[in-house]
A protein has these predicted regions:
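Active-site-flanking beta-strand signature of metal-NTP-handling nucleotidyl enzymes
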Residues: 2-10, 48-50
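Short, surface-exposed ligand-recognition loops at beta-strand->loop->(often short) alpha-helix junctions
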Residues: 8-21
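An amphipathic, aromatic/His-enriched active-site/gating alpha helix that lines ligand/cofactor pockets
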Residues: 28-37, 52-87
Length: 100
């Protein structure tokens, strides 16, 4: 079953482009099981990284693996709390449809 994860990041003022580029560069060689991802800049100046995974297993392998995206960008972001530089959401895709 396909999986989607969304990471919400609040870049420090003026650093959204740098954060975006670090994410893009860190994924340049691909990530096993990641079908596609989008980076959205919201009106509230947040970055949303929307990841589409081939399966829950692929997502869990990434989460439990040696990835370093957060470590790469945390110095450019405002913290949500003492421990977290982002908010993360994930779940299985229960409906998907292409628009006409």
């Amino acid at each position: 079953m396909k999986m989607t994860s969304v990471i919400a990041i609040t870049p420090k003022e003026g650093s959204a482009d740098d954060v975006k580029q670090l994410i893009v560069d860190s994924r340049a060689d691909g990530i096993e099981g990641l079908e596609k991802y989008s980076i959205v800049l919201t009106r509230e100046e947040q970055l949303l990284v929307i990841n589409e995974w081939v399966s829950l297993d692929a997502f869990m392998d990434y989460v439990n693996g040696p990835h370093n995206m957060i470590e790469l960008i945390e110095h450019l972001c405002n913290r949500y709390d003492e421990e977290n530089v982002c908010k993360a959401y994930s779940g299985t895709v229960i409906h998907e449809e292409l628009a006409n």
